[in-house]
Amino acid sequence: MKTPEYLAPLREELAAALKQADNAWSFDIFKHTPKLESFTKECLRVFTPSGKKPLQLRSTGRTLSPGTKFSLPAQQAHLDPDNYPNPNIFDGYRFCDPQSGACDIRGTITPSAKWLIFGIGTSACPARLLATRISQTLFFKVLRKYDLRLKLDNGQPEVVYAATNMFVNFNTQMYVKSASI
């Protein structure tokens, strides 16, 4: 994990949320995880998945030739200093309200010109809430069971690109051990 300083606070938040839910996993658990909400949105902002897909746009009266590639400038919007202060610095609590500590799921799943992670307009992903909650649940399950640390020589994982997609080098190694919760 590139930002291990978030592991302990997120684990604590998970433990408290589970306690409030009598240790039962449910959708309601996310009402008590504002740090996770902000952390998720910051991960999506900084590590924007992007790609290019062939498409014909008949609904707009325009037709792109089959095989024409296009993409939204999501990463450019997410790293624009006019949209986000200090955009190149990962801040897992960027989207938490400084006074209340709250972070609303609507900020993560509502498309806008500044937030393009799930597309925008009529083409926005209809399963964005489900995708977000599944990702968060999987993250919490791993976080609850394991301590993770990247095995790095220089402190930063190598990034590789395939077309317009960015990935951590698949040969990057991790140390994994059972968590002590």
Curated annotation (Swiss-Prot):
GO molecular function: heme binding; iron ion binding; monooxygenase activity; oxidoreductase activity, acting on paired donors, with incorporation or reduction of molecular oxygen
Organism: Aspergillus flavus (strain ATCC 200026 / FGSC A1120 / IAM 13836 / NRRL 3357 / JCM 12722 / SRRC 167)
Disruption phenotype: Abolishes the production of ditryptophenaline but leads to the accumulation of cyclo-N-methylphenylalanyltryptophenyl.
InterPro entries tied to this protein: Cyt_P450 (IPR001128), Cyt_P450_E_grp-IV (IPR002403), Cyt_P450_sf (IPR036396)
Lineage: Eukaryota, Fungi, Dikarya, Ascomycota, Pezizomycotina
One GO process term, biological-process aspect: secondary metabolic process
Function per UniProt: Cytochrome P450 monooxygenase; part of the gene cluster that mediates the biosynthesis of the dimeric diketopiperazine alkaloid ditryptophenaline. The nonribosomal peptide synthase dtpA accepts L-tryptophan and L-phenylalanine as its substrates and forms the phenylalanyl-tryptophanyl cyclic dipeptide product cyclophenylalanyltryptophenyl. The N-methyltransferase dtpB is responsible for the N-methylation of cyclophenylalanyltryptophenyl to yield cyclo-N-methylphenylalanyltryptophenyl.
Source species, domain of life: Eukaryota
Name of the molecule in the record: Cytochrome P450 monooxygenase dtpC
Pathway: Alkaloid biosynthesis; Secondary metabolite biosynthesis
